[in-house]
């Protein structure tokens, strides 16, 4: 069997519910409660469910855009929850979430080339004219 690319075990994300003038925690909303999955290279995973069931929260928690309440996530054998900021940034370049509504995921005021250029610049993959040439190269493929 191929080596797992992504392993998620018993992932949980609970959000506190606060009440009162002092914002006391009155309970928790269990947005994600015990998700486990394994993905090998070349596979594609689609999380499907009704609105509000936790699909986006699973993705954001795997990428550590929000912190998990409990569980384990391993990407290419590395413990994602144990990565330092710089290592996490490198890992995120290799992972992608495609949100369910492409109309709200893409900025209608930017061209596709502009979005690609922005990603290249943000991740420090090129500078100046290198950004333009790399963008053009990617648009040709």
Name each region found by the language model.
Residues 1-141:
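ABC transporter nucleotide-binding domains
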């Amino acid at each position: 069997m191929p080596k797992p690319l992504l392993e998620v075990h018993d992932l949980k994300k609970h959000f506190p519910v606060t009440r009162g003038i002092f914002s006391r925690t009155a309970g928790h909303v269990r947005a994600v409660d015990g998700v486990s999955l394994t993905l090998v290279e070349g596979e594609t995973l689609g999380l499907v469910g009704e609105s509000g069931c936790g699909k986006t929260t699973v993705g954001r928690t795997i990428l550590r855009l929000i912190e998990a309440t409990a569980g384990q996530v391993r990407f290419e054998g590395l413990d994602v929850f144990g990565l330092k900021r710089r290592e996490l940034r490198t890992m995120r370049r290799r992972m992608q979430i495609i949100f369910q509504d492409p109309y709200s995921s893409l900025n209608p005021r930017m061209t596709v080339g502009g979005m690609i250029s922005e990603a290249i610049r943000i991740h420090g993959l090129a500078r100046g004219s290198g950004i333009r040439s790399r963008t053009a190269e990617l648009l040709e493929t």
